[in-house]
């Protein structure tokens, strides 16, 4: 059943029409609300996200984020990229979202501190380790992707804490991360092929006084953008919103200041008022534009999205005592025939929405491919 669903999902990734030549990574730039290549062709990107983590990669290349596993990890991704972009076998990805997995950037000798948990806790982050593994691991993976005809969008290590405030420690963390990444000569030389997504899933952003403010998102990310541009990176920057990257209304009135940017958005079943029980495409279009009004004037990268049907008879009770049905292995639960088709109509309506699935496993039967 899952193999059959993967085939359907792969077909859903195909754009309704192809504008630029597929498999050619000509540098991209923002032109109005579209992505254009160096020849002026309109470009819409479709691909997957992944993270060089032993756990999320199901220990296929090793068990630890240590130097002895670097070569095997790079080789693993080289093979995966060969499967993602292979029209002869029915795969048509042209972008890869690379998470700078914090398992490599966190110092194992540091004690974790603070109240934030999981990947939102940055107390063990090491700038020295980021510099080391940027050159030793992350950028070699990115180069392998480019060699296979894939654009690359880089996401910083970890996820945002729930509550952010202008001038806080996490903003300084993002400044440090992007200062290191954007000053790297390889990254700058590949501007246009490599783009940068500033943060992952902010929930709330407040002004420097801890108050709600219409300018807080702009004021939080503008200083990060300024550092990146000062370092000479000329490629596309993707700006996140709040609400786990679903709220962008304030950017319509108070946008960031830059000449080559778009917005990174997340979409899952149940968001924007759309699900398998409410899959009217016109309502989906209306709600998406209401929450993401910037879709009218800037390109959108939906950097996380996935869905698969409910697995009958399986599930669990969550921490609130609510029954949560299982699916075929994705984050979101929905069918392509209902929610998926409605989402396709949203993309076709606006014509400037690119997307990366939340996991390579959403697109490929990896274990079968690696046999």
Model-inferred region functions:
Residues 1-8:
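Bacterial N-terminal signal peptides that target proteins for export
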Residues 8-17:
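Bacterial N-terminal signal peptides
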Residues 20-49, 58:
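N-terminal module-boundary/linker segments of secreted carbohydrate-active enzymes
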Residues 27-28, 52, 56-69, 164-195, ...:
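Extracellular glycoside hydrolase catalytic/binding regions
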Residues 66-95, 100, 104-195, 217-227:
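An active-site-proximal structural segment forming one wall of the substrate-binding cleft
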């Amino acid at each position: 059943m899952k193999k059959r669903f993967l085939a359907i999902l792969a077909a859903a990734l195909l754009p309704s029409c192809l504008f630029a030549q597929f498999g050619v990574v000509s540098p991209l730039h923002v032109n109005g609300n579209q992505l254009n290549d160096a020849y002026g062709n309109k470009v819409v990107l479709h691909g997957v996200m992944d993270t060089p983590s032993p756990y999320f990669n199901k220990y296929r290349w090793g068990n630890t984020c240590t130097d002895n596993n670097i070569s095997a990890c790079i080789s693993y991704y080289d093979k995966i990229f060969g499967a993602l972009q292979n029209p002869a076998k029915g795969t048509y990805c042209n972008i890869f979202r690379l998470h700078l997995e914090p398992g490599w950037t966190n110092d194992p000798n540091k004690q974790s501190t603070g109240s934030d948990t999981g990947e939102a806790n940055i107390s063990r982050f090491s700038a020295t380790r980021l510099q080391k593994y940027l050159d030793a691991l992350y950028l070699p993976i990115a180069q392998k992707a480019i060699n296979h005809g894939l654009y690359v969008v880089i996401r910083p290590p970890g996820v945002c804490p729930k509550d952010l405030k202008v001038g806080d420690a996490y903003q300084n963390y993002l400044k440090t991360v992007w200062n290191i990444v954007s000053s790297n000569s390889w990254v700058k030389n590949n501007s246009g092929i490599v783009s940068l997504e500033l943060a992952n899933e902010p929930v709330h952003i407040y002004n420097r006084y801890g108050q709600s403010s219409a300018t807080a998102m702009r004021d939080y990310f503008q200083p990060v953008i300024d550092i990146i541009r000062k370092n000479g990176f000329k490629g596309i920057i993707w700006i996140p919103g709040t609400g786990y990257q679903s709220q962008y209304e304030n950017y319509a009135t108070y946008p960031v200041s830059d000449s080559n940017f778009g917005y990174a958005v997340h979409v899952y079943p149940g968001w924007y008022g759309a699900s398998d029980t409410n899959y009217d495409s016109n309502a989906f279009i209306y709600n998406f534009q209401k929450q993401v009004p910037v879709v009218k004037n800037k390109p959108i990268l939906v950097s996380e999205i996935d869905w698969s049907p409910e697995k009958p008879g399986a599930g669990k009770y969550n921490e609130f005592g609510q029954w949560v049905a299982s699916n075929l292995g994705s984050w979101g639960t929905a069918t392509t025939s209902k929610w998926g088709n409605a989402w396709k109509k949203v993309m076709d309506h606006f014509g400037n929405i690119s997307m990366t699935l939340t996991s390579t496993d959403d697109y490929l039967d990896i274990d079968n491919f690696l046999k």
